[in-house]
Amino acid sequence: MSFWHVLALLIIAHALADYPLQGDFLSKAKNRRAPIPGVPWYQAMAAHVVIQAGFVWIITGSAACAVAELVIHAVTDDAKCCNRISFNTDQAVHLLCKVAWAYVAAHTVP
């Protein structure tokens, strides 16, 4: 697939995984600064980033990109939840990662 095709798929997947597939519960539960009683924040964060990383793996075929997505997405979302970065910065980091994964996927020989 071309860079633009992969990038479009990654952006669509990101929109799905960061909004309807995350939902209100995971969005709140992953915040360690305002935890939901009885719900370990790290389990909610793990569920969210595994969904994100899974889409990256399925679309790019790259386990390395998926692992990088998992780690970077978790760190970025935690920084947003802890008010160290803004929502817009969070989304910009996510989209820059998608550009990187699309580049890797488009330039990797199958």
Model regions: which residues?
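Alpha-helical transmembrane segments
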Residues: 2-12
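Interhelical loop and helix-boundary elements at the membrane-water interface
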Residues: 10-52, 70, 74-110
